[in-house]
């Protein structure tokens, strides 16, 4: 077995797994590891016919991770392993059905990433709606929540530093490890005491919120169901927020680089940058000269 970090977080020789193969594969691993895996899968696993990989949340103390790694290494199903912030493995698919194929090549092996942390919270944070519930992947849902957090109940000081940042901001943050967190953000001072760096310092000012119902209440939504997808979030803010706040959130969401790369949802109007024709440029230049 190799034990190194592969570039891009991807193990060699792995491919998609069919939905019917997920349970027997995880069953076999559960017997070896002695931990619940099936109830702690993250994202869209099991919600569509094929999954590119499997992410599993594992409740394990930091000091017990080496022991978990040894158990994983000992499994005959695990052919390769790499460690970073997660434990990445190449696992033999149990009951592999070669007749089931998809757009990406299938190899009989799937990547399973073991992610140490709080399974309950990670299932909330990494939640991905089913294909019947949303046209968009879970990343859109998370980016929408993060955009709401950046703007809802944001309190900025009138005083600003030289680069235009407020001296102090109170805001929500959507944290993959801590939950929904209320923080006080200040510009990070330079070590020499002369001004500030481009970084910020976030100090938690309230206890983190991890319960979905409490998160929905803090974000002034209706119920935890509103957190399900991009569509449910958009409908909830349109129902509960002032129109100017809705417009700001949707405009900021549409400008996000990841959203633009994947494709801005059809129900958000996108302002295309205005382009000047050569004739317009020449006319404007003449007007400038005549001033």
Task: Name these PLM-found stretches.
Residues 1, 7, 266-291:
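Intrinsically disordered, compositionally biased, charge-dense segments
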């Amino acid at each position: 077995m190799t034990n190194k970090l592969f570039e891009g977080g991807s193990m060699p020789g792995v491919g998609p797994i069919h939905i019917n193969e997920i349970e027997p594969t995880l069953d076999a691993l559960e017997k070896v590891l002695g931990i619940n895996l099936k109830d702690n899968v993250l994202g869209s696993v099991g919600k569509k016919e094929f999954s590119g990989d499997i992410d599993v949340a594992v409740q394990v103390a930091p000091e017990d991770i080496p022991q978990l790694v040894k158990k994983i290494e000992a499994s005959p199903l695990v052919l390769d392993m790499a460690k970073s912030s997660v434990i990445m493995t190449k696992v033999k698919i149990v009951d592999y059905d070669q007749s089931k194929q998809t757009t990406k090549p299938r190899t009989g092996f799937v990547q399973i990433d073991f992610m140490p942390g709080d399974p309950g919270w990670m299932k909330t944070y990494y939640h991905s709606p089913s294909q019947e519930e949303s046209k968009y992947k879970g990343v859109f849902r998370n980016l929408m929540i993060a955009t709401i957090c950046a703007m809802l109940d944001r309190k900025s000081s009138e005083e600003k530093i030289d680069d235009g940042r407020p001296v102090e901001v109170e805001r929500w943050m959507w944290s993959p490890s801590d939950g929904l967190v209320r923080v006080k953000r200040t510009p990070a001072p330079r070590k020499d005491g002369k001004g500030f760096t481009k970084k910020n310092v976030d100090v938690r000012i309230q206890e983190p919120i991890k319960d979905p119902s409490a998160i929905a209440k803090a974000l002034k939504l209706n119920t935890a169901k509103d957190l399900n997808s991009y569509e449910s979030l958009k409908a909830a803010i349109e129902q509960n927020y002032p129109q100017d706040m809705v417009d700001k959130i949707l405009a900021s969401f549409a400008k996000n680089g990841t959203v633009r790369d994947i494709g801005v949802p059809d129900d958000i109007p996108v302002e295309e940058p205005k382009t000047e024709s050569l004739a317009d440029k020449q006319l404007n230049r003449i007007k400038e000269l005549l001033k």
